[in-house]
UniProtKB/Swiss-Prot annotation:
Residues 1-18 form the signal peptide. It holds the Pfam family Apolipoprotein. One of its GO terms (cellular component) is extracellular vesicle. This is Apolipoprotein A-I. It comes from Anas platyrhynchos (Mallard). Major protein of plasma HDL, also found in chylomicrons. Sequence repeats lie at residues 67-88, 89-110, 111-121, 122-143, 144-165, 166-187, 188-209, 210-231, 232-242, 243-264. The gene is APOA1.
């Protein structure tokens, strides 16, 4: 019920303006404090930085609530960093297990890829040489046009376009031809690689059913062990957070109770 009251109070009070809030050094009415608190909270979210938190804690409301937001923020950050650090070894353990169990398959696939790579290397080198040669010829043919561009006027734009269009189209068609030639040369090796991969997967499926079951059991066991190791770490992190959450909740409820008594 108190959560609902707090929510309604925040919804109704967010439209008010806390004028001269930072100059308030005298005790305020609970309603004013809650209104100012909401305004400062919105400004803090907007600023999203420690400067806003420090400014809030230096205000009248901040001093009275004494939330120690900056200290709590640093503490929570340290707790999160510790949790991440504690989790790292277990993540590494699972990763190493996975790499070890798939080492044989990865080695075979790498070997097949290297074989195909060596077969297609001449075609790639040939394509690269032709592509470079075509671009150089294109550059040389454009050199005179580039000189004319220095003195280009509106009257010469159409003439310049007429000169450039056939050159660009010819270069485009020739480059497309080289790409198509490369595609045709690589197609058989692409099919070969696809067939080898399919064959490896089929062999694993046919021969590796017992191994797959064993591996599945091993993964389940590792995940179970990981969960057991992670549980106390997460619980420790939760326990670190609880005091700050309870402290914040208690102070807000106290302020709201005082407000309800005042307006009653």
């Amino acid at each position: 019920m108190r959560v609902v009251v707090v929510t309604l109070a925040l919804l109704f009070l967010t439209g008010t303006q806390a004028r001269y809030f930072w100059q308030h050094d005298e005790p305020q009415a609970p309603l004013d404090r809650l209104r100012d608190l909401v305004d400062v909270y919105l400004e803090t979210v907007k600023a999203s930085g420690k400067d806003a938190i420090a400014q809030f804690e230096a205000s009248a409301v901040g001093k009275q609530l004494d939330l120690k937001l900056a200290d709590n923020l640093d503490t929570l950050g340290a707790a999160a960093a510790k949790l991440r650090e504690d989790m790292a070894p277990y993540y590494k353990e699972v990763r190493e297990m996975w790499l070890k169990d798939t080492e044989s398959l990865r080695a075979e696939l790498t070997k097949d890829l290297e074989e195909v790579k060596e077969k297609i290397r001449p075609f790639l080198d040939q394509f690269s040489a032709k592509w470079t040669e075509e671009l150089e010829q294109y550059r040389q043919r454009l050199a005179p046009v580039a000189e004319e561009l220095k003195e280009l006027t509106k009257q010469k734009v159409e003439l310049m376009q007429q000169k450039l269009t056939p050159v660009a189209e010819e270069a485009r068609d020739r480059l497309r031809g080289h790409v198509e030639e490369l595609r045709k040369n690589l197609a058989p090796y692409s099919d070969e690689l696809r067939q080898k991969l399919s064959q490896k997967l089929e062999e694993i499926r046919e021969k590796g059913i017992p191994q797959a079951a064993e591996y599945q059991a091993k993964v389940v066991e590792q995940l179970s062990n990981l969960r057991e190791k992670m549980t106390p770490l997460v619980q420790d992190f939760k326990e670190r957070l609880t005091p700050y959450a309870e402290n914040l909740k208690t102070r807000f409820i106290s302020l709201l109770d005082e407000l309800q008594k005042t307006v009653a």
